[in-house]
């Protein structure tokens, strides 16, 4: 029956039972108060007389600790050894052990006596102690590439149970393979406290890649969480296999810049002195790895090298290119030309690489420079030429002014939207901007001037038919043009609501009709004269006139029209 109870208890309370034991287990912490429960608090039966705690001594014999009478508040401590000042009882009858130590790892029994029964409940106590933080000691000063060397010893102290140590490289666990990695661990116990210390020694075969590797030691313990030592890096010694030359100056290199050449070798410790080959000339530098060219010119472009002091064959080469850009533009500044003249624009350039040229006119980008073989007013403006290569840019500009005497290109009229005014529009070309003079008074509506083209508008109220002149002038000449303007009042009488253009159109139609009548009369007269002459010829010869009655009738009608 006892074995069945143990098996059942193992299933329902596995977390509290020690492996291989049927007793519930309590985990206490070293140096702190350990609470040992009495039947998990179910210890107050009816008719309770007293509760007693006892323990199993090292030799297996029982030892009394204390007794608590049900009718009394304070317990009676019966222990005579080290527990005398360390034990007490809680309100729920749990045993309290102050300043827990490894000597408390034993079995404690709670005896509950009532008027009808006597029960005992045993609990096994285990004491855990978190280890000290891991520390790597006896560290090697440097590791040699490819050689098995003891890197260091990791130590943790004062733990229970003993801690496990794991070596890590770059947060990856190292595994003992018996060749390139060998790990040896030892555990020792303090004879007084019984606490354990663990040490682990790592022998490691380094590689060049381990120069930046970080080695740590991790302590794993049941009290958790894991503790990690301070990361350590180690110097790895290996010979130089490759030399590299770098140009550390900003790119691109321009004339006037300072250029720094830096020579590096992959050996460790790295070499500190080098030979620099400056366009065929050897220059030795000691205790540094750089050489500086000051104020370079395009002549400094070429091949540069560096090598070890004791091995000229192991070298590195770099090509240095000094960028330059020479450019000039003709013309520049202010350029004054006449309308229709020719302007030749010349851009000269010389550079270390392909040149990019962009043109803008009045801040607007141009696909290409316009054709200036015959200048127009619209060609005037501020032209900017940007010439550039990577890292270098030059800008040139010229401001072109195209001048010409004024010329009127159009003079028109129309009635205003409200029908109460006449609006005259005079359009002219010229530069400088022409000034306008009208032969009649009116209101200047608006004036615009764009690309040598000027537009002037005048609003008038003609009370009679007028001939209006538009005169435009500038310092280079003048031009004038006339236009007929009819009175608004006369136009309103015959055809109210019609505009002046409609009146003019009616006059044209009347003229055309009259012209057609006159042409018809003229044709009839000519035809009549022709018939008359023909008849006279017939009378002279005595020949009878031939023709149908319809033709005769048509001739008489035409003659009649001609007489009219």
From Swiss-Prot:
Entries under Gene3D superfamilies matching the protein: Immunoglobulins
Ig-like V-type domain location: 25-127, 131-229
Topological category with respect to the lipid bilayer: Single-pass type I membrane protein
Positions of the UniProt region annotated as Disordered: 539-564
SMART domains in alphabetical order: IG, IGc2, IGv
Pfam families recorded: C2-set_2, Ig_2, Ig_3
Gene Ontology MF annotations: identical protein binding
Major localization class: membrane
GO cellular component, one term: axon
Signal sequence residues: 1-24
Subcellular location: Cell membrane; Cell projection, Axon; Cell projection, Dendrite
Bias type Basic and acidic residues, positions: 541-564
Tissues where the protein occurs: Expressed during axonogenesis in a subset of developing sensory and motor neurons that fasciculate with each other in the central nervous system. Expressed in the retinotectal system of both embryos and adults, with expression in all retinal ganglion cells (RGC) during embryogenesis but only some RGCs in adults (at protein level).
S-S bridge residues: 38-110, 154-217, 263-306, 426-470
Domain of life: Eukaryota
Glycosylation sites: 92, 350, 441, 465
SUPFAM superfamilies linked to this entry: Immunoglobulin
Keywords, in A-Z order: Adaptive immunity, Cell adhesion, Cell membrane, Cell projection, Developmental protein, Disulfide bond, Glycoprotein, Immunity, Immunoglobulin domain, Membrane, Repeat, Signal, Transmembrane, Transmembrane helix
InterPro entries named among the record's database cross-references: CD80_C2-set, Ig-like_dom, Ig-like_dom_sf, Ig-like_fold, Ig/MHC_CS, Ig_sub, Ig_sub2, Ig_V-set
Residue spans crossing the bilayer: 508-528
Segments on the Cytoplasmic face: 529-564
Chain ranges on the Extracellular side, renumbered to this chain: 25-507
Described purpose of this protein according to its UniProt entry: Cell adhesion molecule that mediates both heterotypic cell-cell contacts via its interaction with CD6, as well as homotypic cell-cell contacts. Promotes T-cell activation and proliferation via its interactions with CD6. Contributes to the formation and maturation of the immunological synapse via its interactions with CD6. Mediates homotypic interactions with cells that express ALCAM. Mediates attachment of dendritic cells onto endothelial cells via homotypic interaction. Inhibits endothelial cell migration and promotes endothelial tube formation via homotypic interactions.
Subunit structure: Homodimer. Interacts (via extracellular domain) with CD6 (via extracellular domain). Homodimerization and interaction with CD6 involve the same region and cannot occur simultaneously. The affinity for CD6 is much higher than the affinity for self-association.
Domain free text: The CD6 binding site is located in the N-terminal Ig-like domain.
Protein name: CD166 antigen homolog A
Gene: alcama
């Amino acid at each position: 029956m006892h074995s069945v109870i143990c098996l059942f208890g193992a299933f329902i309370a596995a977390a509290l039972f020690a492996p291989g034991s049927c007793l519930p287990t309590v985990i206490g912490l070293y140096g702190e108060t350990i609470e040992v429960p009495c039947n998990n608090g179910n210890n107050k039966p009816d008719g309770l007389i007293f509760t007693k705690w006892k323990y199993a001594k090292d030799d297996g014999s029982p030892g009394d600790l204390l007794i608590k009478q049900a009718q009394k508040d304070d317990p009676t401590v019966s222990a005579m050894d080290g527990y005398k000042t360390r034990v007490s009882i809680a309100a729920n009858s749990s045993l309290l052990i102050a300043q827990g130590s490894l000597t408390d790892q034993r079995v404690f029994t709670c005896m509950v006596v009532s008027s009808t029964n006597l029960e005992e409940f045993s609990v096994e106590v285990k004491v855990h102690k978190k280890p000290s933080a891991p520390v790597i000691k006896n560290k090697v000063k440097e590791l040699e590439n490819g050689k098995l060397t003891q890197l260091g010893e990791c130590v943790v102290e004062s733990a229970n149970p003993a801690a496990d140590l794991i070596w890590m490289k770059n947060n990856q666990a190292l595994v003992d393979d018996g060749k390139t990695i060998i790990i040896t661990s030892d555990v020792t116990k303090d004879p007084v406290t019984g606490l354990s210390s663990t040490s682990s020694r790592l022998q490691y075969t380094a590689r060049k890649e381990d120069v930046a590797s970080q080695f740590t030691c991790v302590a794993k313990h049941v009290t958790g969480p894991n503790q990690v030592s301070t990361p350590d890096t180690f110097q790895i010694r290996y010979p130089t296999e490759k030399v590299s030359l770098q140009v550390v100056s900003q790119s691109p290199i321009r004339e006037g810049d300072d250029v720094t050449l830096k020579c590096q070798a992959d050996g460790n410790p790295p070499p500190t002195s080098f030979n620099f080959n400056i366009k065929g000339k050897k220059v030795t530098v000691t205790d540094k790895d750089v050489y500086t060219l000051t104020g370079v010119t395009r002549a400094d472009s070429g091949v540069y090298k560096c090598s070890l002091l004791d091995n000229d064959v192991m070298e590195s080469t770099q090509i240095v290119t000094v960028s330059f850009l020479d450019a000039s533009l003709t013309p520049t500044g202010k350029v004054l030309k006449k309308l229709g003249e020719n302007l030749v624009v010349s851009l000269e350039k010389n550079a270390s690489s392909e040149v990019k040229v962009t043109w803008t006119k009045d801040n607007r980008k141009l696909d290409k420079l316009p054709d200036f073989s015959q200048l127009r007013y619209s060609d005037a403006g501020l032209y900017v030429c940007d010439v550039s290569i990577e890292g270098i840019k030059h800008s040139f500009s010229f401001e072109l002014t195209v001048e010409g005497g004024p010329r009127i290109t159009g003079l028109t009229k129309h009635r205003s939207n409200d029908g109460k005014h006449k609006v005259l529009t005079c359009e002219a070309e010229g530069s400088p901007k022409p000034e306008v003079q009208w032969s009649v008074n009116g209101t200047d509506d608006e004036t615009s001037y764009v690309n040598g083209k000027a537009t002037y508008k005048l609003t008038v109220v003609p009370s009679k038919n007028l001939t209006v002149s538009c005169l435009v002038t500038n310092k280079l000449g003048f031009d004038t043009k006339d236009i007929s303007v009819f009175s608004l009042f006369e136009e309103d009488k015959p055809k109210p609501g019609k505009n002046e253009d409609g009146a003019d159109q009616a006059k044209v139609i009347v003229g055309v009709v009259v012209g057609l009548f006159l042409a018809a009369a003229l044709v009839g007269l000519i035809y009549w004269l022709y018939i008359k002459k023909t008849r006279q010829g017939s009378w002279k010869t005595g020949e009878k006139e031939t023709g149908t009655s319809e033709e005769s009738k048509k001739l008489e009608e035409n003659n009649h029209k001609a007489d009219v």
